[in-house]
Amino acid sequence: MKIIYAGTPDFAVPALRALIQSSHEVSLVLTQPDRPAGRGLKLKPSPVKSLALEHGIPLLQPETLKDEAVQARIAAEHADALVVAAYGLIIPATVLSMPRYGCYNIHASLLPRWRGAAPIQRALLAGDKETGVTIMEVVPALDAGAMILRGTLPITEHDTAQTLHDGLAEIGAELMLQAMDKLEREGRLEAEPQDESLVTYAQKLQKAEAVIDWRKNADELSRQVRAFNPFPVAHSTLKGETCRIWMAQAVSGTAEPGMIASVDNGILVGCGRGLLRIDELQLPGGKRLQAKDFLAGNPLCPGDRFGS
């Protein structure tokens, strides 16, 4: 089949790679314009653009899909399907109606739970036991299309947003390829409408959410730390400096909220209930360090405090 692929970040790379390596033809890639990045703020191509260039696939990088010239270019492809993965631009109904067999999205949650911008992080924060990927029809409403395929991934106490992201991207690639193969064979895909009574929304992360409140339970703080790794990274003050906390686990024990109880095996800090064992942390201008290495250069003692 002739497929147009719309995606931008790392999450969208495995599915594009799978389609490139398949019998399908990716005739055009849509991705967001290059953005300034790094200290020099040089324009940087999206990961999807880099992969498309590597394989010589034609690219479009419009600021909007409402532009008539852009729509004419997409229509000229006479594509069988449009595949979407974390593209980041609204796709107008006129574009959705162009492909012969429709438009299909890779969404990183088990819909209808966690529609929206940050499904991976919200699943972790909420303490969900599993997450997954839904292959769905694209409709004008946000993540509201009928569901075609779903794949699940358990959430463990060691998972971060990054580990889940990577696992879900691979599952999404596998499921989307299955869907496109079936679409080519049968000319249609069976789809199940979402149960609107079960819908929850995954609001975009706000940097203010990354501040650690030591009055919360250790389980909740562990999920916060892991959900905000690699962005925006949970943090607290330590001796007047902002300390970023990259990895932490909840353990049993008691101490005043924010007070260091022990530094013998990780840095154990009191919470509203239980202790948070900080395993990896970072001071301004420094590297991410395991707790043992951090303590070698930044001695801490029981009774020292995190937070104001």
Swiss-Prot record:
Protein's name in the database: Methionyl-tRNA formyltransferase
Keyword Hydrolase assigned: no
The EC number(s) this enzyme carries: 2.1.2.9
EC class (word): transferase
Source organism per UniProt: Methylobacillus flagellatus (strain ATCC 51484 / DSM 6875 / VKM B-1610 / KT)
Catalytic activity: L-methionyl-tRNA(fMet) + (6R)-10-formyltetrahydrofolate = N-formyl-L-methionyl-tRNA(fMet) + (6S)-5,6,7,8-tetrahydrofolate + H(+)
GO-annotated cellular components: cytosol
Coiled coil: none
Function statement: Attaches a formyl group to the free amino group of methionyl-tRNA(fMet). The formyl group appears to play a dual role in the initiator identity of N-formylmethionyl-tRNA by promoting its recognition by IF2 and preventing the misappropriation of this tRNA by the elongation apparatus.
UniProt binding sites for (6S)-5,6,7,8-tetrahydrofolate: S109, L110, L111, P112
Domain of life: Bacteria
Gene coding for it: fmt
Protein family (similarity comment): Belongs to the Fmt family.
Record's keyword terms, sorted: Protein biosynthesis, Transferase
GO MF assignments: methionyl-tRNA formyltransferase activity
